[in-house]
A protein has these predicted regions:
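ABC-type ATPase nucleotide-binding domains, specifically the catalytic core motifs of the NBD
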Residues: 15, 33, 71, 96-115, ...
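The feature captures the beta-strand-to-loop junction immediately N-terminal to the Walker
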Residues: 36-38
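Helix-to-loop junction immediately C-terminal to a conserved catalytic motif
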Residues: 51
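Conserved ABC transporter NBD signature motif
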Residues: 59-68, 79, 112-117, 217-219
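Conserved ABC ATPase signature
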Residues: 134-138
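ABC ATPase C-loop
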Residues: 151-152
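Catalytic Walker B motif of ABC-type/P-loop ATPase nucleotide-binding domains
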Residues: 159-163
Length: 239
């Protein structure tokens, strides 16, 4: 499989200060790519560039071989990149069913929406089981899974997850990561940023360690996880 997403020599930042410095990064089609690193490494900035919320000052961002670095977030969404934010984003007073259906707000083909909803229910049983309950009645981990379901209503080519385990207890984090693994096994390409390096790299087929806006180390997730060069810097603090 080839690269679905490529960042080539990307420099980007805010207010005249660069956070990313000539960054090269690739996401292979069909892979789980996990970015880890200390606070301030530029992980979230990468996701902002990929989703169109921040335009690079230098370099190229290519998706399926086409440049997307100058596109709006909406245009990038239409290209097939869908992001699930770190913050809880469900509408608390709306039902689970209503929240999930809203994921297809750009799809005007009602039969297609119904088919996707059926597929989502098969993948995420909680959507059917709790469909009439308000989103606020769900636990943090359950809400995160419903957010995944909502994102899949757009059938993204690339699913981008910003720290999906943030604020979750270890048991719930395991459930969420098992769900991410299942989505990937079903054919979904996933790019995630994860503060918990052990969990993220243990899940990933490709691991990337960032520091000061650059890629410091990358390779197979398991190899990066066990590399002594980064263990004392990242893993001890984020386990």
């Amino acid at each position: 499989m080839g690269a679905l997403l490529e960042l080539q020599g990307v420099t980007a930042g805010y207010g005249g200060g660069d956070i990313l410095h000539e960054l090269d990064l690739g996401v292979e089609d069909g892979a789980i790519t996990c970015i880890v690193g200390p606070n301030g490494a530029g992980k979230s900035t990468v996701l902002r560039v990929v989703s169109g919320l921040l335009r690079p000052r230098l370099g190229q961002v290519r998706f399926r071989g086409s440049s997307i670095g100058g596109l709006s977030p909406r245009a990038i969404l239409h290209r097939g990149i869908v992001q699930v934010p770190q913050e809880r984003s469900l509408f608390p007073t709306m039902t689970v069913w209503e929240n999930v259906r809203m994921g297809a707000y750009t799809v005007h083909d009602r039969p297609l929406v119904d088919r996707r909803l059926q597929a989502v229910c098969e993948t995420f049983p909680i959507v059917r089981e709790r469909r009439l309950e308000p989103a606020a009645s769900l636990s943090g981990g359950q809400q995160k899974i419903v957010e995944f379901a909502r994102a899949l209503m757009l059938d993204p080519a690339l699913l981008v997850l910003d720290e999906p385990s943030m604020g979750l207890d270890p048991k719930t984090r395991t459930i969420v990561f098992d769900t991410i693994r299942a989505m990937n096994q079903a054919g979904r390409t996933i790019l995630l940023v994860e503060q918990n390096a052990r969990s993220g790299l243990g899940l990933a087929s490709h691991g990337v360690v960032m520091e000061s806006g650059r890629v410091r180390l990358e390779g197979l997730g398991s190899a990066v996880l066990n590399n002594p060069e980064i263990g004392h810097l990242y893993l001890g603090a984020t386990a």
